């Protein structure tokens, strides 16, 4: 066998990993998103480009590396950061191939359990084997290792979740790459330590352990939640290799110090904050604010250790897991290989089995109790990594099983290769349409469509992160429509955001200083001691009142000189509360939604005129011709892209397009513009023929027509 692809040699394993890396990187580059995407992409790109501070926990290592990517003079800034994700994911795929190869190099516990005469007889039997047969067996062993490395590497490459984050600006692929690199170093240290002891040497390979410790600290600077969850498994691996003695030795202190040295990457946060960058989330200059930011204080409310939450999340996890290798049906082969791999892992090396069992248990214990709307599948990546590692063991088991049949050796090898190739091909085919973002202009088009009907100098209020995050990129990085005053009302509940507004819209903030200053004073007090406001109804009422007054003033002061717009999500809340109050006149708006106290009076003060994808406030009730812009809808509903049912496009973006078309039609219908109303309803039905509000509204048009 050519030593370049011989899994028994160092260069052979490196060549296999390199092949996986090349395939992975090529796949990700061909399916790379050409611009900004939804969720956190826009904010992360803006923070990286300006060396700012991203949302908690700040992910300093990612921001620094992504910033370096933005300096590459190829493509737009978003493409460069998207490519960084692709590079990290490709390296992760290569790392998992090396990890599987490393674990298969460690002698099986079944082999190492042979003692005394059994061991001697085994040696004599081995010496008496026919050289040709020995050569065949050696070749088969090398082939199974090659197959295991390739299968695990390629299945991780094409797995749905990793691939989905490999084509956009997100932190998770870097996190996976570092996690697998730590695992690789630790298992190599374990093997070399065992070999050292067997030879009777006294020079254990602690450099690998220390390197893993330093890398662990660095990895904490990306997505520390999932990294921390690997600690029980890593501690178990150390114990199984060194025993309790390690935890009493200076080596533990050295490893801990190196991990802390890696953690020093977090010094970036206060240093960056002191520069007052454009994106300075949390403004972590002081130790107190730094601690709030790193610990993700604002997200801790998403944790709910209840059986109901776990039951719902478990169903969601099962769906994610079933789709990893191509979809509910296509995944059966990959999942079967995973199960077989875990069984083989248990038989071959129980330490490896329990290591990954601990990774899975720790991850599920937290992820099943963390209820967030987006990126939920990313929190299960440690489980999916473990599944992919198991497929490598499963591939080895499958080949050995086929080789033991009565098939001729050549035919058996061909059958094994074909079976494994089929598993990889099905995973690729099943996940390609879900993860091909080479024509993903949805977020960029969304922002363009929103801007298209906002007049120069207009103000836009939104509660929708899918609007605001990509808008940060388009406005602050690409410098488009800098005249638009875009405000995320959710972020008005964070004091750091006012620094951003003061820098970006100084005239607007100066004009509203009288209402902003009192609220900001209360807000900073609330941030220090939210419990005090919860317990004290007077304080709670005061901060709510000041928040409402500030928003009403922002709108009333702006509308004197320029138009003001709001996004559809605000009207959805308004309609929801209005319906409750229609049934119960004594109902308090704030009791049904935290934004009710300002949404209801604001929307009651003005007439709402649908303009494209937004509503414009009007101070009178006269009819205003609603804008009918030529909306960019590339990939939205033309069949060129496929979205999961829980995808943000289906859940939040598409409903805005459809809903605003219907709102325009209803507005026109209310003012006797029958033909125009019909056109608006039909536009919605062209995108989604089953959209019930459009169908119902279209049915009602003749009844609303003048008689």
Protein language model features and the residues they cover:
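ER/secretory pathway lumenal C-terminal domains and tails of membrane proteins involved
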Residues: 101, 168-169, 173-176, 181, ...
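Aromatic- and kink-enriched transmembrane "portal" helix at the membrane-lumen/periplasm boundary
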Residues: 29-30, 75-82, 116-120, 136-142, ...
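Transmembrane alpha-helices of multi-pass, membrane-embedded glycan-processing enzymes
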Residues: 66-70, 81-104, 108, 155, ...
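Short hydrophobic/aromatic helix or loop-helix immediately within or flanking a transmembrane segment
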Residues: 48-76, 86-87
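Transmembrane-helix motifs of polytopic, lipid-linked glycan transferases
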Residues: 83-135, 181-185, 339-340, 389-393
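Extracytoplasmic catalytic/substrate-binding loops of multi-pass membrane glycan-assembly enzymes
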Residues: 32-44, 54-65, 278-283, 438-443
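Membrane-interfacial, low-structure loops and terminal tails that flank and connect transmembrane helices
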Residues: 1-12, 103-144, 193-207, 244-246, ...
């Amino acid at each position: 066998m050519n030593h370049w692809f011989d899994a028994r040699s160092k260069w052979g394993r490196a060549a296999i990993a390199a092949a996986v890396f090349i395939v992975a990187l090529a796949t990700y580059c061909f399916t790379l998103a050409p611009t900004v995407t939804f969720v956190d992409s826009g904010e992360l790109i803006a923070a990286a480009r300006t060396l700012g501070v991203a949302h908690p926990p700040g992910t300093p290592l990612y921001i620094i590396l992504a910033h370096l990517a933005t300096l590459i003079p190829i493509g737009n800034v978003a493409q460069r950061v998207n490519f960084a994700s692709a590079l990290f994911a490709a390296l992760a795929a290569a790392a998992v191939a090396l990890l599987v190869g490393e674990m298969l190099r460690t002698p099986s516990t079944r082999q190492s359990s042979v003692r005394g005469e059994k061991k001697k007889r085994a040696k004599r039997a081995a010496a008496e084997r026919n050289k040709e047969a020995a050569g065949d067996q050696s070749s088969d062993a090398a082939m199974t290792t090659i197959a295991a490395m390739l299968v695990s590497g390629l299945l991780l490459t094409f797995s749905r979740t990793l691939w989905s984050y490999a084509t956009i600006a997100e932190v998770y692929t870097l996190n996976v790459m570092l996690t697998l690199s730590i695992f690789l170093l630790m298992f190599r240290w374990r093997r070399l330590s065992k070999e050292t002891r067997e030879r009777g040497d006294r020079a254990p390979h602690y450099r690998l352990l220390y390197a893993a410790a330093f890398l662990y600290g660095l990895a904490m600077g990306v997505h520390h939640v999932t990294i921390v969850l690997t600690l029980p498994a890593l501690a178990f691996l150390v114990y199984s290799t060194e025993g309790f003695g390690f935890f009493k030795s200076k080596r533990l202190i050295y490893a801990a110090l190196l991990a802390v040295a890696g953690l020093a990457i977090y010094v970036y946060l206060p240093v960056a904050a002191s520069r007052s960058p454009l994106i300075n989330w949390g403004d972590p200059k002081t130790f107190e604010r730094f601690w709030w930011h790193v610990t993700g204080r604002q997200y801790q409310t998403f944790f709910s250790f209840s059986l109901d939450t776990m039951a719902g999340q478990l169903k969601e996890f099962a769906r994610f897991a079933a789709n990893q290798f191509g979809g509910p049906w296509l995944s059966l082969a990959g999942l079967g290989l995973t199960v077989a791999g875990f069984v083989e892992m248990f038989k071959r090396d129980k330490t490896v089995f329990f290591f990954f069992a601990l990774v899975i248990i720790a991850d599920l214990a937290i992820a099943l109790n963390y209820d967030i709307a987006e990126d939920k599948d990313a929190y299960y990546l440690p489980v999916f990594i473990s599944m992919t590692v198991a497929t490598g063991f499963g591939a080895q088991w499958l080949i050995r099983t086929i080789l033991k049949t009565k098939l001729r050796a050549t035919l058996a090898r061909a059958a094994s290769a074909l079976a494994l190739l089929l598993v990889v091909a099905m995973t690729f085919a099943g996940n390609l349409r879900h993860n091909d973002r080479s024509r993903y202009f949805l977020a960029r088009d969304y922002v363009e469509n929103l801007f298209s009907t906002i007049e120069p100098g207009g103000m836009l209020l939104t509660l929708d992160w899918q609007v605001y995050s990509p808008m940060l990129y388009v406005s602050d990085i690409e410098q488009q429509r800098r005249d638009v005053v875009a405000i995320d009302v959710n972020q008005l509940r964070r004091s750091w955001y006012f620094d951003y507004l003061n820098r970006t819209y100084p005239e607007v903030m100066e004009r509203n200083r009288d209402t902003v200053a009192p609220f900001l004073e209360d807000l900073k007090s609330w941030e220090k001691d939210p419990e005090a406001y919860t317990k004290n109804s007077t304080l709670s009422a005061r901060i709510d009142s000041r928040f409402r007054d500030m928003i009403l003033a922002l709108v009333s002061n702006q509308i004197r000189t320029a138009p003001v717009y709001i996004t559809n999500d605000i009207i959805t809340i308004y309609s929801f509360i209005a319906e409750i109050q229609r049934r119960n006149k004594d109902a308090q708006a704030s009791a049904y939604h935290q934004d009710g106290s300002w949404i209801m009076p604001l929307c009651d003060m003005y007439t709402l005129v649908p303009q494209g994808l937004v509503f414009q406030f009007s101070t009178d009730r006269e009819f205003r011709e609603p804008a009918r812009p030529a909306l960019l809808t590339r990939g939205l509903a033309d069949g060129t892209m496929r979205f999961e049912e829980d995808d943000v496009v289906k859940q939040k973006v598409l409903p805005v397009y459809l809903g605003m078309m219907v709102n325009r039609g209803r507005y026109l219908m209310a003012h006797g513009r029958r033909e125009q109303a019909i056109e608006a309803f039909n536009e919605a039905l062209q995108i989604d023929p089953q959209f019930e509000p459009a169908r119902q509204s279209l049915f009602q048009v003749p009844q609303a027509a003048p008689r």
